[in-house]
Amino acid sequence: HMIALTDLAQLDEVVAADPQARFLVQTSVFPSWDWLAAHPDDQFRYADGSVETSIPLASVSSRQWRVDYGEQLRNLVRNILSHSNGDRVVGMLIGYMTSGEWFYWGTNERKYSDYSPVNVAAFRAWLAHKYSTDAALQAAWHEPSVTLPTAQIPTPAERDATHAFDLRDPSTSDQKTIDYYRFMADEIIDAQEHFREIVREETAGRWLTLHYFGYGYELSDYPFRANYGGHMAYARRSFGSPTLDMAAGPYSYYWRGPGQPGTSHTTQHSWALYNQLYWHEDDTRPTELPTLIQLARRNAARQL
């Protein structure tokens, strides 16, 4: 059973109905509004300086968020392990950002992020690691006045600029935007690794660790989603990661109806090459039984 855990009593309820139950528990690492009020520089921020008001969001680059909510995650794992049915838990899915699927909030609406002070500082640190010197950065960005301590996140206009269709040319000033998107993708995976390592440490590696992630197909339906989303480092960094057992995602929201193939968000079979699993979740909610049966048959056949 995949269960979005909000109360440990949920484990007991499922076991009462299914005495053989085993669980993948789903949790998230969203901060509280109070935490954001105490850490304003760590709050996820759009290009115009505004913050998200519909849900509390810390910058993925915030080290303080990683530390504080890593400890909350550690406490949750310990509580599960000490619960009477805790031995039935076999893994944990850790979610964050849009729908818990680790792509940046505002991606679907083309809202430019993350311009928070902590993200600017993290971007500069990433650039310093890549370029080492001001001269190397200036040459790559074709920007004679930029320095490692003063580099800024590209503006929305810079992020929209392309040279050939939707492609960017790394031999031009496009490199600034290329660097930023690589950085943003790296930060997501760095954060994921931080939280996974806590789970593996507390469970001595007994639990599977996974995320909704790796949407190489689904986030490529529009070029801006591929860039803004932050998933595109998964082939470079998630494949073969020793702390990532599985990735997950719903079936594609294209071609998922009766008689349609139910395609994947990700490069599904690539994960198997690295001895990793991919969990396909069907979040279709048909109202008619024949449709439900047809979709179940299609999904089962697709996995064979």
Short names for language-model regions:
Residues 33-35, 102-103, 256-259:
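Extracytoplasmic/secreted cell-surface and envelope-processing proteins
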